[in-house]
Amino acid sequence: MVTAEKSRIDCRHIDVLDGIRAVSVIIVLIFHFWQQTWIFPVIKTPWLASVGITKIDFSNFATVGYLFVDMMVLISGFLLFLPLMRSIILGEEMSGWKNYARRRIARIVPSYYFAVLLLFFASALPTGAYATTADALKDLFAHLTFTQTLWVNTYIATPLDVVLWTVAIEVWFYVLFPFVAEFIKGPRNKNRQSFTPAYGIFFIFAVFNIINYVYTENFVLKGNVYLAMRINQFPAFLGVYSIGMLGASAFVLIAKNCRRSRIFNAVNTLFSVCSILLIIYLINDCVATQERQVWQVTERSKLAFVFMTFIITTALSSKWYRWLFSNKFMRFLSGISYNLYIWHQWLAVQCKNTWRIPKWSGEIPPNMLNITYWMNRYAVVITVFAFAAAILATYLIEKPFANLIMGRPVFPLFAKKLLKTANSADEECINEEESAPLSAEVDSFADTVDSDKPAENAAANPWGEQETDRNDSDCD
């Protein structure tokens, strides 16, 4: 029997997003690794031979894994709009835009700037990657201002990290979002009754999709254009963000008006599985077409809608099914996914072409000669390097600097140990007045550390994404 408290749908911390984001980043990683290794991800299943299944082939996901960058962008948009929809539908109070900007900076900037500056000064400049000083300064300026997608030589041809373009797309939507949110909320005066948030939502949805359509038809599909340069510009993702907005409003409405039950959970589990099958169908359809980039841009909104359906139904599914996407391992992967996305491709390329790890000689890379033992060793090396870099960058750069920006202890574990030490000292201290200053100082640390818990932190900062949220980015 489900209690009233357990039957409520949590629209603050959506635990399954950890796993969905992690899986999306891993699929993008598989795509980039496949480009370098030429190894197709095929799992042999001799134990299933009796039922006619001798292997599970993920090759199609490898060849068009870049499509899951859209999933990362969609998750980002969904989470951005979620607090706004809670405010409109549930009447929750929102914190100010200053806190919003602070959280966005804390989440994005430390790891991103670290990667840009390290690669520029430690790799690109020493290796003479730029023809002129002007080219170098332009590339650096474009990346520091998140405008690298505007020029070919700072985007596709950059000697820095190409995958950082997705971060730039998200940052520009972060900049746009406050204006969109204020418009949706409507005027704060007596005329508010004539302009409800629902009108604002549908108006923004229409405007975003019109811009997306006009851009696609006139700047992507018409004429002799460089598709790779056009399909991932900011206007091409407005349709995806609009679907994230509708998904957030739908999810909060469901959370307000529905309660969990065995039948409710089971039905959503079934719909989630059907969504996965539909995603597989769309992936196969993309692989089957000759113009995959054209398919990507023309079917982007359709794919985003299926992704959104998968996200919502998975979040509303049965507990055992949600656990697949919200267990500790998935939370760990989600925690390092931003830096995993940032570093995986650059390290893979450097290992093969610059450092030649594993060792090889000659002019033709071993994967092009189908030297399988080298290809397998190389796949292991770049996987280890990517995860090692992600873990180090997350716990030595991203989290400490994010804590610093948010006014939290830079190293929370140290603060907790300090608290334990102070408590022990308090017990042994004869003079309570002498121990009070230290105890008060450490208690303030403890309050800050404890506020890092996902549910409590979401309540205190409704504009912030859930604490385990990482992009990506993917995203992508």
Give, region by region, the residue ranges found by the protein language model.
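C-terminal "closing" transmembrane helix and its immediate cytosolic amphipathic cap
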Residues: 1-9, 31, 321-330, 345-447, ...
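Aromatic-enriched alpha-helical transmembrane segments of multi-pass intramembrane proteins
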Residues: 138-168, 173-303, 351-358, 363-385
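Outer-pore turret/helix-boundary of cation channels
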Residues: 128-139
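SF2 DExD/H RNA helicase N-terminal ATP-binding lobe
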Residues: 454-459, 463-467
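Kinked, hydrophobic transmembrane alpha-helices enriched for aromatic residues
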Residues: 11-84, 102, 106-128, 145-154, ...
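Membrane-interfacial segments
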Residues: 84-92, 122, 126, 130, ...
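Juxtamembrane loop-helix boundary motifs flanking transmembrane segments in multi-pass membrane proteins
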Residues: 5-8, 52-56, 89-97, 101, ...
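Functional transmembrane helices that form membrane-embedded active or gating regions
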Residues: 5-26, 63-64, 97-102, 108-109, ...
